[in-house]
Amino acid sequence: MKNLNLVALPHFVSVENLKNDEVKALIKRAEYFKKGGAVARLTSPVYVTNMFFEDSSRTHTSFEMAERKLGLTVIPFDPAHSSVNKGETLYDTSLVMNALGIDLEVIRHSQNEYYEDLINLKQHQKLNIGVINAGDGSGQHPSQCMLDMMTIHEHFGHFKGLKVAIVGDITNSRVAKSDMELLTKLGAEVYFSGPECWYSEEFDQYGKHEELDKLIPKMDVMMLLRVQHERHSGDPNEKKFDAHRYHEKYGINHKRYEAMKKDAIIMHPGPINHNVELSGDLVESDKCMFVRQMENGVFMRMAMLEAVLRGRKLGGLE
C-alpha cells in the first residue's frame, strides 16, 4: 500500500512546482534519516550515475553518499573522458545511459534548464530515465535549497514570519533563486543585500534590496553567497573586484556578527571564500550553520532520491 505521507516524483529538477506539504514531508523524511531511521528495502537493483559537468566537492560527494546509504548501485561517469568531448549531446549521452540500464542520473550542467530536453515526454519516446538536478547554470539548485530549508526548520521549527537576508552575487546564484522562491512560498520574509550590479529588479517580487548594516539586527537568517567569478565573463565589474573592499562592505566580520540577533544564524552554500563573504575565524562559530548544512545535505538528498524512486516505482518502492 502506498504511504500517503511520502513524496513521489518522476524527476526532481526544480522547487518551482513543489507544494508546501511536499516540502515539509521531505524535511520530515530527511530528519527521520538523520535520526537513524531505517531506509526502505529495495526489492530489485537501482542504478544511478552522477554526471557533473561543472566542478563540485560537496554536492557530488553528498549525492553519492546518499545513494549508497539508500542501497543504490552507483555507476561512475567522468565527463572529461566521455563522448561529450567528441560532440555527443547531453540528450544522446542520457539515451546511452538509459540503454545501458541506468535508472537515474544526477546532473550538474552549465546550461540553464538543461533538463527540459530530458524530461519532455511528448518530444522523446525512447528516453525513460529519472533526472535529479544538481545545479543548472545560474538557474536552480533544488537540493541545496531543500537542505537549506531543512537547516532553517531544524533551528527555528517553522518558516512563517522569519526574516531572511540573501547577500552577495544574487544574479548569478542558482542557490539564491531557488531559496528566495521557496522561502517566500513557505511564509518567510526575504531581503537582499550586496553589489547592485549583481542584483536584478526581477527579484523585487520576492523582497527588497537594503544596505547590509541596516538589515543585520533585524534578520533571523543571514544567507551569504560567494561571488561567482566563473560566470562573470565579459562583466566589467569583475575587473574592478577587490576582495578586501567586498569584505568591508558586504562581508560578515566580528562587528556585524555581534550585531546579529541572539538566535540568528549564518548560512552559506559553499565554497566559502574566507575573509570575503565571512571572516575566516567565524566559519566554525556558534551561529554559522555551514557544517550543519553539509551534514543535512546527505539526509535531504536521501529523501529527494527516495521520492524519485517512489515516483518511478524503482526498487519496488511505491
Swiss-Prot record:
Top-level enzyme category: transferase
A single GO BP: amino acid metabolic process
The keyword RNA-binding belongs to this UniProt entry's keyword annotation: no
Gene Ontology MF term list: amino acid binding; aspartate carbamoyltransferase activity
Pathway info: Pyrimidine metabolism; UMP biosynthesis via de novo pathway; (S)-dihydroorotate from bicarbonate: step 2/3
Gene Ontology CC: cytosol
Pfam family, one: OTCace
Highest taxon of the lineage: Bacteria
Binding residues for carbamoyl phosphate: R58, T59, R108, H141, Q144, G270, P271
EC number(s) reported in the record: 2.1.3.2
Similarity remark: Belongs to the aspartate/ornithine carbamoyltransferase superfamily. ATCase family.
Record note on quaternary structure: Heterododecamer (2C3:3R2) of six catalytic PyrB chains organized as two trimers (C3), and six regulatory PyrI chains organized as three dimers (R2).
Biological role: Catalyzes the condensation of carbamoyl phosphate and aspartate to form carbamoyl aspartate and inorganic phosphate, the committed step in the de novo pyrimidine nucleotide biosynthesis pathway.
Protein's name in the database: Aspartate carbamoyltransferase catalytic subunit
Organism: Lactobacillus delbrueckii subsp. bulgaricus (strain ATCC 11842 / DSM 20081 / BCRC 10696 / JCM 1002 / NBRC 13953 / NCIMB 11778 / NCTC 12712 / WDCM 00102 / Lb 14)
